[in-house]
From Swiss-Prot:
GO terms for biological process: regulation of transcription by RNA polymerase II. GO terms for cellular component: nucleus. GO terms for molecular function: DNA-binding transcription factor activity, RNA polymerase II-specific; RNA polymerase II cis-regulatory region sequence-specific DNA binding. Keywords: Developmental protein, DNA-binding, Homeobox, Nucleus, Transcription, Transcription regulation. It is found in: Nucleus. SUPFAM superfamilies: Homeodomain-like (SSF46689). Belongs to the Abd-B homeobox family. It comes from Gallus gallus (Chicken). The gene is HOXA13. The keyword RNA-binding does not apply. This is Homeobox protein Hox-A13. Residues 224-283 bind DNA.
Amino acid sequence: MFLYDNSLDEINKNMDGFHAGSNFAAAAAANPCRNLMAHPAPLAAPSAAAYTSSEAPAAGMAEPAVKQCSPCSAAVQSSSGAALPYGYFGSGYYPCRMTHHNAIKSCAQPASTFADKYMDTSVSGEEFTSRAKEFAFYQGYAAGPYQPVPGYLDVPVVPTIGGPGEPRHDSLLPMDSYQPWAITNGWNGQVYCPKEQSQPPHLWKSTLPDVVSHPSDANSYRRGRKKRVPYTKVQLKELEREYATNKFITKDKRRRISATTNLSERQVTIWFQNRRVKEKKVINKLKTTS
């Protein structure tokens, strides 16, 4: 596991007092071989690597890309199958990704496979601020596994130095039930919180002119009434003349009236039906008044 800090004294204090929840972290804390890594260019001075007090390089000397220390047998045994827990340190809240510009002090044994598994050192310094932050460390808490509040999903957004324009999001998103997810999913993915929501009323409008949505049932449709077009005086005169001749219209008569008045046969039929109903209402009204 890699830490960064500006002070060597704070690094030693953090590593001596670190109690992790996995076998690898416990072995790394007890072993004198420290896996330390310096800040990248935006976080510290250029080419500033973390060393113990006895191994600090002389000023002006070129620093190697990887500096090896004595073999760490305890870390070799537990690094292959150890899982990385949440760590809590008292001096910052940093991601576990570093660039290749600075030196890395690691063990020469296969314990470095643990760092290769969880670290990506092939990216440039410019890509550091845009890469996904897969691990985070919280400050001001005691050692132990992270216990989130039930009913909430904790999604911290790791701040990056040099990227002040990056928006910060709320760390607590309400959910119906807490669902832990794997740490390999990354922290940059958008989190969707499913919640039961009442369906809003259906406001979709059909492009068809004769189809409208029913207000009581959003999924059912009924044929709407077309706009009423009043008959002209010439049409009404012809219809009234034919009605006076015969209240019930025949097929041949309907076709002839349709051609004369420039109306459809359906319109002619409906007009005769309405005219008979109207006459019936007038007769019934006269009977009731008399």
